[in-house]
Amino acid sequence: MALSPGSQTPTLSEDSSILTADQVRSIVSALPARCRLCNWRLEYSSRRDGISLRSLYRAAAGKHCSGESVLVVRDTNAHSFGAFTSEPWRVSPRYHGTGESFVFTVEPQCVAYRWSQKNDYFMFGRGNCLAMGGGSGFALWLDEELLHGNTGESDTFDNPCLASETEFEIMYVELWTFEPS
């Protein structure tokens, strides 16, 4: 589903190293209604907090992270993409999340890929990686150093490659959560 900027502009706790205001509005237009009027809080930024999956998990377990989040990645070829998750990121032996989860591209074009209902492989976290989607492949996979990732077609979201290439180098990663406005 192609996204266009909606009328809702949330207040961001800090400037994003990845997203423009129009891109934020486009993502907001795809969010569940309960999240659309919320302000965004930057829980983790690789630019601010260093490049470490452990740091991202620690931020995701913080007092402000009780539920939904937006994970955004920018690769070294200036493509931006990410995921909305209905549950917090955590290390788990199995997939978790709900059908509200989706993956998206932001740059070069804003498009959301929603749950296909083919499986329920929404999100999982291990000590050495995190991933969205599954079946034929991961929609999004990031390594423990947050330096490399891969993306491909996933049965969960029926998405194409989200990045500039299936294997990519990461420039920035951000994790945003929602606060009532």
Language model: regions and residue ranges:
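Phosphate-recognition beta-domain surfaces
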Residues: M1-S69, R74-S181
